[in-house]
Amino acid sequence: MTEFGIRNMDQVAPVYNGHRAMLKRQLAFDNVSVPTSLYSGLFSAYEEEQAVPTGLDSYSHDSSSCELPLLTPCSKAVMSQALKNTFNGFAKKRFRLGILSNPWLWDENNVFQWLWWAAKEFSLQNVNFQKFLMNGHELCSLGKERFLALAPDFVGDILWEHLEEMMKEHQEKAQEPYIDHSNQDSINHWMNADSLNFTTDPLQCGAQVHNYPKNGMFNDMCSVPTGQTLLQPKQEFQQYPSSCLKSRAVNYSPASQDFARSNMNALLNSLNSGKLRDYDSGDSGTESFESTESLLQSWTSQSSLVDMQRVPSYDGFEEDGSQALCLNKPPMSFKDYIQDRCEPAELGKPVIPASILAGFTGSGPIQLWQFLLELLTDKSCQSFISWTGDGWEFKLTDPDEVARRWGKRKNKPKMNYEKLSRGLRYYYDKNIIHKTSGKRYVYRFVCDLHNLLGYTPDELHAMLGVQPDTDE
């Protein structure tokens, strides 16, 4: 062999892959214990040689590294706060629509309004509202499992959490001790109640009750001696036994119940058939819930008493609730209610005490319209507020004095007529009180006070010695 050939061999040898291939195959043989897997070992070795590096060789294949990260306390807090903010959206609606904070005492209308809000808030489709044609007591008595079976998919847990939170919140309030007055301003500010000036009056909620003997359920439940405070402040309806709640019928006559149910059924049928889509607002940032509020009010305003029940109140429990919820009796007027209690109007006392009226209507704390009726039926107040002699029309002769007394009743020393008038304006849309056009400080009750109170305007005028007002 020539020198040229030897040099040529030296040049070619380094690129000859035969020996390396033999080592690869030998490696395959050494790694295979079963003769039948000869070719599979060869192919695996070949694939190993041809493998393209991916940069993932150092990545751990431990199963624990593939799990989703657990929720940290921080992320849980963020989610909880987000839900809480969403729930607060309903709280604002509840105050505006006059829905009680205690879901145990909701009627069918309140339950529907809550579900309607949830459907819009969570963009729920094809919600069968007929499944929830029940009052608040029935709703809260379902329990979580039965509730989830009726609720829409995916959001049942959230809705139940919201309902449960409202129940717990009210239960905690009912068990709270006396609340320091210094906390009232911050609470009222959070609830944005200053615009309506329906605020907590701890003194009034626990007012002296010498003049009104307590009989019935509340006397047994509370066992409060005469002359002591009946209930603690910042306290609304408590969770009473189901027997008392189911018999709660003083607020509605059978006819109005049937009418409300028939209207609600018609509304639910329209909702389920998609006929209310025209009511939805197409403008961004405008909630369609508000666009249907007029429709909801059209069938909740069939009874003036129902309307009065819807007026929001941010105070505590009414002074007298002994007969407001014990109600195996047929619906009656306030006049019959007083006579049934053997409490005739005392000389020098208002014919319609606001505390007893609040207990009769079941509205909870004393509301502005009830307070005005108390002043109007008290002869000693005729110097600053009185009937004009024209039906249910009345005049604030001294509006500042009326505002001052309302502020004293509600523990709001800074109350003035401007703030009081904002509360009065709220009643306009509810068809409870209207402003008389062309007359200053003159208003008129436009709801059905005759059926509610059992008195005609002329009867009250005669009892109070009211003469027709000829000044204007």
UniProtKB/Swiss-Prot annotation:
The gene is ets2-a. Its main location: nucleus. Probable transcription factor. It comes from Xenopus laevis (African clawed frog). One of its GO terms (molecular function) is DNA-binding transcription factor activity, RNA polymerase II-specific. Keywords: DNA-binding, Nucleus, Transcription, Transcription regulation. This is Protein c-ets-2-A. Belongs to the ETS family. It is found in: Nucleus. One of its GO terms (biological process) is regulation of transcription by RNA polymerase II. Residues 85-170 form the PNT domain. It comes from the Eukaryota. The keyword DNA-binding applies. The keyword Amino-acid biosynthesis does not apply. Residues 366-446 bind DNA. GO terms for cellular component: nucleus.
